Amino acid sequence: MVTSRAGEIAQSEIRRNNLSRMLSELHLRGPLTRSELAAILRLNRSTVASLIAELAARGLVWERSRDKPAPQPTPGRPSPVVEICREGPAALALELSTDWIRAAVIGLGAFVAVSVSKDLSLASSTPEQAVDEAHDLVGPILARLDHGPRVAAIGVSAPGAIRAEDGYIYHAPNLGWRDVPLGSMIGSRFADLGVPVFVGNDAHLAASAEHMRGSGRGTADFICLWGEGGIGAGIVVGGKSLSGAAGYAGEVGHMAVDPEGAECRCGSHGCWETEVGEEALLRRSGRDPKGGSAAVADLLEAAGKGEGGALAAMAESGRWLGIGIAGLVNVFNPSRVALGGLYARIDPYAHDALVNELDCRAMPAPRAMVELTTASLGADALLLGAAELALAPILRDPATVPLPGDAAAISSRRRARPPSYGWTLTPAEARR
């Protein structure tokens, strides 16, 4: 009896694992035929059919006919494809940045149902005001989803040292926030949704999205440097995100590069951020260091016109970027480093100075292996990363999504065509 019970548990765990594998493949690869799923997962066709049926019953996938013929047509009827159900569970993704708030409802497969943004200086706002602004921003977009995806979780991207287990912000220097229980605040303000809340560091989430869908795809060792006001890093080692003991890893902006340097917002002196952050860039160009995104846009326009002061400021920031990146290359030996946010935008003007410094300071062996690129998902990397964080529990265990009781509704959903609203984000669209 004990052996039989143990066997049942083992079979149940195997099935849950296979459901997770199948849903994850569809989430990342897009529509696949049953034959393709069988080959990828190395499962027999009857098992694949059974898994598809359960995922469909849970409202996670559906089957449809091919819109286009297969590259190599085969005799008989065209094979239907299995794809993510766009009316299934989705994440409410929130991005809290220094100069704006963005929100989107994003489903499995990176399907963006709706998004909205508002320019707002969070550095001049209290955490309570920021959460209220986010709630007010989100209300109208949720009202547009009467017949669309259902929000199953909230994912939040924010700068600073954030405790992974509960979304507690220990310190966000660029927002002026310290000891902020952001996760519980979001949960209370959005209590009407009745869903779990997940909060992550912006650079970590950007790296996650880029590693899964963008510039880091196909690499096991990857670093994404991200920042607007400051700079942070998301680090992937051996295919896994490096978060540290409590989730605080990656605060590379506060590495000391000049002990006698300028005072940093964190309270130390000579942090890397004081040389490569937004304020340093604007100050070098003769602009108001507190000018924010509008001043950066003006600087980029001036650089595009060949203005000497703007180009010199970019080059000096590039030099300091190279100094810091060389240290990261020496320590982590990544195969690829991607620049995102502000650093992707200034790269055309800072690139040569950055590479020159990197070549001089990185050890020859790890330098020879690393590719320097820009983040391909653009500004949407943070929202996509927040959505991935929120949807991860469903991907790990699709069986947690309840089975609806209406068999007719399940059958209808299997046959239905995808709705016409929304879009699936691709790297090409992210560069628009």
Tell me what each language-model feature is.
Residues V112-D221, P348-C360:
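Glycine-rich phosphate-binding loop and adjoining helix at the ATP-binding site
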Residues L28-R29, R213, E228:
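Short helix-capping/turn signature of helix-turn-helix
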Residues R217-E275, W423-P427:
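Glycine-rich phosphate-binding loop of actin/hexokinase-like ATP-binding domains
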Residues A203-H204, I231, L339:
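AAA+ ATPase active-site-proximal loops
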Residues M1-P78, E83-S117, A123-R150, E260, ...:
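ATP-binding/phosphotransfer module of carbohydrate and carboxylate kinases, centering on a glycine-rich
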Residues A158, G227-G229, E278, G341-L342:
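Short secondary-structure boundary segments
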